[in-house]
From Swiss-Prot:
The keyword Oxidoreductase applies. It catalyses: UDP-N-acetyl-alpha-D-muramate + NADP(+) = UDP-N-acetyl-3-O-(1-carboxyvinyl)-alpha-D-glucosamine + NADPH + H(+). This is UDP-N-acetylenolpyruvoylglucosamine reductase. Its EC number is 1.3.1.98. PANTHER family: UDP-N-ACETYLENOLPYRUVOYLGLUCOSAMINE REDUCTASE. Its cofactor is FAD. The gene is murB. It comes from Rickettsia bellii (strain RML369-C). HAMAP family: MurB. The active site is at 168, 217 (proton donor), 287. Pfam families: FAD_binding_4, MurB_C.
């Protein structure tokens, strides 16, 4: 395989399991960490959209299937995590910046509206992509625009309106890598902001299995319902397939209890979908992304 000439690092047959919160999954055929945006653009231009591309963030809301990922898996590293101010007073944040890091930066700098990010695992890029939200706020409420690059190597900008935010999603082109996000700045009081962040952390600790190997919310909430309530009603609290189980603490969280496979987790989620539909007539939609190839040792649907 002839790979584009880059300044960054390639790794072949790279184990992705240790990068995910679930600690499951196969290897990346090729793993690439670009040095900067220009290095990424050079790779994409040289690639000419020949090799399949998968982007990878913090690994917090994802199941990588046991057969791994074909083509090139791109992970943006520390060089894409800067936080700064624009000339017009907005915040500009690299897409690999952790949500928690941005929340803490805003608290220290007395910027309000970002408190909810302390309760959302993952990166800014992933948060924008899925319009992540919690405690009454979503990314669409604070975002001005994004800077991105398409798989052909063209730099592009999208405003909040052009992104087309919807519940846990957007209408952006699929062949896009988010590089930076620009946010509104509203001044607040650091002590008040910290108090709200502490409230959110306390609520998470008491209601979510945050110390377990989990991937966050498994299913998006159907309109007018809470997924966890539907799962609980179907009698699935604590239900287990192999080493994968539904959390006893919060039914919309799956847990790897030690040696679960990606297949066991995905099979568990699909089983929950089926049983909730049989019980309530409501189809739950996955919020966790499932990517990669199914292992030849077993088939997984969905």
């Amino acid at each position: 395989m002839n790979l584009p000439i880059v300044k960054g690092e390639y790794r072949k047959d790279y184990n992705l399991k240790h990068l995910t919160w679930f600690k499951v999954g196969g290897n990346a055929e090729i793993f690439f960490k670009p040095v900067d945006s220009e290095d990424l653009a050079s790779f994409l231009v040289q690639n000419k959209q020949k090799l399949p591309i998968t982007t990878f963030g913090a690994g917090s809301n994802i199941i990588i299937r046991d057969g791994g990922i074909e083509g090139v898996t791109i992970k943006l590293g520390q060089n894409f995590s800067n936080i700064d101010f624009t000339d017009d007073g907005h915040l500009i944040v690299g897409s690999s910046c952790l949500n928690f890091s941005l929340a803490k930066f805003c608290q220290v700098n007395a910027i309000s509206g970002f408190e909810f990010l302390v309760g959302i695992p993952g990166t800014i890029g992933g948060g924008v992509a899925m319009n992540a939200g919690a405690y009454g706020c979503e990314f669409k409420d604070i975002l001005v625009r994004i800077e991105a690059i398409d798989f052909a190597g063209n730099f592009r900008t999208f405003t909040n309106e052009e992104i087309g935010f919807k519940y846990r999603g957007n209408n952006l082109p699929k062949d896009l890598i988010i590089l930076k996000a620009v946010f509104k700045v509203n001044k607040g009081n650091s002590e008040d902001i910290l108090a709200r962040m502490n409230e959110i952390n306390a609520a998470r600790s008491s209601t979510q299995p945050i110390k377990e190997r989990t991937g966050g919310s498994t299913f998006a909430n159907p309109e007018g319902f809470k997924s966890w309530q539907l799962i609980d009603k179907a009698g699935l609290r604590g239900y287990r397939i192999g080493d994968a189980s539904i959390s006893e603490l919060h039914c919309n969280f799956m847990i790897n209890n030690g040696n679960a496979t990606a297949k066991e987790l995905e099979d568990l989620g699909n089983f929950v979908q089926q049983k909730v539909f049989e019980d309530s007539g409501i189809k739950l939609n996955w919020e966790i992304k499932r990517i990669g190839k199914v292992s030849s040792r077993g088939l997984t649907t969905g």
